[in-house]
């Protein structure tokens, strides 16, 4: 474990060991919190926690993104196509493709971005 009582909003770039409970969740919209878990210039890992009914608004960005559903259920729309995803499912969103979601059962998404999302730091 990390140093007891040490909390941060964001780990350092290229920080090798990041302990979940030391990264404070940051607001990321109504009913959504975000934890940036690790990143380099070329890669970023982000945990997003959603309350039931929370929305990840449709958007696009110049990053390829892989989303792994850790828990819960979501209606995901990617490039105009909507699917229900649950724990264990994975979604690939190529750069520039519009995507968003609605959380239908409270849950957690793990996002991997390449390159890193500079707007998250």
Where are these regions (language model features)?
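Conserved short histidine dyad/triad with adjacent acidic residue
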Residues: 44-60
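ATP/adenylate-binding site constellation spanning eukaryotic-like Ser/Thr protein kinases
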Residues: 42, 63, 71, 106, ...
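Short acidic-glycine-tyrosine-enriched beta hairpin
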Residues: 80-95
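A short, N-terminal "cap"/entry segment at the start of jelly-roll beta-barrel domains
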Residues: 2-42
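Ligand-binding loop in jelly-roll beta-barrel domains
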Residues: 95-119
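A cytosolic small-molecule/anion-sensing beta-strand core signal
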Residues: 47, 70-71, 86-87, 105
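Glycine- and acidic-residue-biased ligand/ion/polar-headgroup-sensing regions
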Residues: 63-74, 79
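Short beta-strand segments in beta-sandwich/barrel cores
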Residues: 55-56, 72-77, 90
């Amino acid at each position: 474990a990390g140093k007891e009582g040490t909390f941060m909003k964001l780990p350092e770039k290229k920080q090798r060991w990041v302990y979940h409970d030391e990264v404070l969740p940051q607001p990321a919209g109504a009913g959504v919190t975000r934890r940036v878990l690790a990143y380099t210039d070329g890669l970023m890992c982000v945990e997003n926690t959603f309350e039931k009914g929370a929305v990840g608004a449709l958007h696009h960005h110049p990053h390829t993104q892989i989303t792994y559903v850790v828990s819960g259920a979501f209606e995901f729309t990617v490039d105009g196509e909507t699917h229900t995803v649950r724990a264990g499912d994975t979604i690939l969103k190529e750069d520039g493709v519009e995507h968003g979601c609605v959380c239908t059962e409270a849950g957690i998404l793990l996002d991997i971005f390449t390159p890193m999302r500079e707007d998250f730091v």
